[in-house]
Amino acid sequence: MVVSPSTMAAVRASGAVPNAEFLLAADGIRKEFPGVVALDDVQFHLKRGTVHALMGENGAGKSTLMKILAGIYQPDNGEIRLKGAPIRLDSPLDALENGIAMIHQELNLMAYMTVAENIWIRREPKNRLGFIDHGEMYRRTETLLERLGIDLDPETRVGELSVASRQMVEIAKAVSYNSDVLIMDEPTSALTEREVEHLFRIIRDLRERGIGIVYITHKMNELFEIADEFSVFRDGKYIGTHASTDVTRDDIIRMMVGREITQMFPKEEVPIGDVVLSVKNLNLDGVFHDVSFDVRAGEILGVAGLVGSGRSNVAETVFGVTPASSGTISIDGKPVSIDSPTTAISHRMAFLTEDRKDTGCLLILNILENMQIAVLQDKYVANGFVQENALSEACEEMCRKLRVKTPHLYERIENLSGGNQQKVLIGRWMLTKPRILILDEPTRGIDVGAKAEIHKLVCEMARQGVAVIMISSEMPEVLGMSDRVMVMHEGRVTGFLARSEATQVKVMDLASR
């Protein structure tokens, strides 16, 4: 028997729920998309008052299962039970009405609306005349935020908030539905260390209130810090569930990838050549000031700094996204004027942006179209026409080399996992055969197996003589991959560290000056 969402909601409201060991359970779940079995007979069991992490490589099926539990997708087979009662979730609204809320990696809030309006959208309190009672709405919001320990003004427009604060609004909105289950997809991907600590305090408080939290993450340290137990998926199959205290980091990696990852940072000593890119006294009014650095052939220059230090802004200016106010950019010792990305590409420069959804992928296009848009090389153009067969073969070979998981090149890129999207974007730039490669957060939101593969690719390009600039918020990545580290703070370069002398303490000291 399948209980309708409305019936289950009534059962929840009455408190007369069936006795059950698990708050939420899914068994025998199968989901197919054209050419792909995303989930194959998987299971997932969530206990009340626990944080249950979901681990796996990109494309393992984690997000697909969570979207099924949140009512976004419907399974082809299997059963979902809430507090022991079978339930069918035909839409996200069904899930919300039954106490299951999902906070997506790309936050779904209205920037032009206030905090309170976002939280109570379509559920606003009304006065006797049937109009929205704004006073009551703001009072309810204040009470809710205070209960959660969130310090926000209910009347502030969401567009004025930081990513971390917007996330707090999403959590408050989920709790306002009296949710029993809260699904969080990569919640710390864009947060500072201090913001992560605040988020974890709120998660622990929610756990104490008996809420079951599903926590999707690629960050191993978070699993051990916040999760009570975890489940691993691989290639659409359920691998196992364990208490986080019973396993080591290496155990989890083996479960995730089905193989040993012998070296996360395969950095090799390669000959460092002449200066390829030289930046002198670069300024962007109100953003960064007097930035100077050189990058040599075969060198990986790591760029570290706290959020807001200006790292990404410098990269965008060097690539011509935002032209500089003053300063000089030289390639092979000759000053160049880079006033657009097209000009940068013509100088064999490549730029992998930090936000693959907004500024990297063209989500409505397929893999082939996304990979080929940056290719301006003569070998793919003859008499003004693109040689489509040669270009398609090159893209297909690149996908094989990067191990992109897809049934074919005509799959829309929005249907790929985050890690596979990132591989496609890297492939886009590898096809241009760049001499200068700028990577901004190249492994953000990527699983441990894909990270190792991307690190290997970066080292391979350095070995081929490419000058690499790698911006990263992950300290082990900066220290493990860089020949030198440039550190920024509040729009200024505060120092350089050679690989042999770079430590986390020294980098953080320079990043906070």
From Swiss-Prot:
Gene Ontology CC terms: plasma membrane
Intracellular or extracellular location(s): Cell inner membrane
Membrane-protein topology: Peripheral membrane protein
SMART domains named in the record: AAA
Pfam families documented for this protein: ABC_tran (PF00005)
Every ABC transporter domain range: 24-260, 270-510
Gene3D superfamilies in the cross-refs: P-loop containing nucleotide triphosphate hydrolases
Record keywords: ATP-binding, Cell inner membrane, Cell membrane, Membrane, Nucleotide-binding, Repeat, Sugar transport, Translocase, Transport
EC number(s) stated in the UniProt entry for this protein: 7.5.2.11, 7.5.2.7
Keyword DNA repair on entry: no
Binding site for ATP: 56-63
Family note: Belongs to the ABC transporter superfamily. Carbohydrate importer 2 (CUT2) (TC 3.A.1.2) family.
Biological role stated in the UniProt entry: Part of an ABC transporter complex involved in carbohydrate import. Could be involved in ribose, galactose and/or methyl galactoside import. Responsible for energy coupling to the transport system.
Protein name: Putative ribose/galactose/methyl galactoside import ATP-binding protein 2
Organism for this UniProt entry: Agrobacterium fabrum (strain C58 / ATCC 33970) (Agrobacterium tumefaciens (strain C58))
